[in-house]
């Protein structure tokens, strides 16, 4: 079983595209794309993690 992860090393970014590729975070919130998710991960000081790809 491989752990799902997202590489957020190039974030945070000042602006995200409107591309819709939903990611479900460990906070049970659906993020619109990797950029939005990674920005939130950075803001949470790493406490937010990936639950799964797709809507929560």
From Swiss-Prot:
It is found in: Secreted. Keywords: Disulfide bond, Glycoprotein, Protease inhibitor, Repeat, Secreted, Serine protease inhibitor. GO terms for molecular function: serine-type endopeptidase inhibitor activity. Its main location: secreted. Disulfide bonds join 8-38, 16-35, 24-56. Gene3D superfamilies: 3.30.60.30. Avian ovomucoid consists of three homologous, tandem Kazal family inhibitory domains. Residues 6-56 form the Kazal-like domain. The record marks 18-19 as: Reactive bond 3. Glycans are attached at residue 45. GO terms for cellular component: extracellular region. Signal peptide: none annotated. SMART domains: KAZAL (SM00280). This is Ovomucoid. The lineage of its organism: Eukaryota, Metazoa, Chordata, Craniata, Vertebrata. It holds the Pfam family Kazal_1.
């Amino acid at each position: 079983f491989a752990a799902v992860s997202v590489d957020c090393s190039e974030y945070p970014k000042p602006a995200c595209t409107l591309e819709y590729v939903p990611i479900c975070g460990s906070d049970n919130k659906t993020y619109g794309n990797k950029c939005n998710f990674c920005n939130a991960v950075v803001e949470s000081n790493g406490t937010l993690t990936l639950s799964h790809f797709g809507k929560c």
